Amino acid sequence: MSEKIISVAVSGYFDPIHVGHLDYLEHAKKLGDKLIVIVNNNHQCVLKKGKPFMDELDRVRIVKSLDMVDEVFLSVDSDRSVCKSLEEIKPDIFANGGDRFESDSPESGICKKFKIKMVDGLGEKIRSSSSLTGLKEIK
């Protein structure tokens, strides 16, 4: 009988991708066997910062090319969360980056519902995409 493959999901805008994202993805990959990256869609970028710096399909293509990534999933959500995407994927683990924690995560409810383990604080907050592009997050 074969062992269960542990799937780890992470999410991000990757707009643009930077070294902090790579650190986050490398740490997440170590948590399981299969790394699934949810890339936030263009609509979510508009909600966060007014407009995407890069198109969602370009961001998906770049993330797919990374060695540590096993699968890329374009977010199906219409708000800033990835709750619906997690409901579709149903990974074993949902990992947040260094600047996100379960206590402030909109995904915590869906993770409890589907018994998805949450892991927080992966990688350091080295820099932000908005600091690279000059685009500011909309609060």
Where on the chain are the PLM-derived regions?
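Nucleotidyltransferase catalytic core that binds NTPs
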Residues: M1-K139
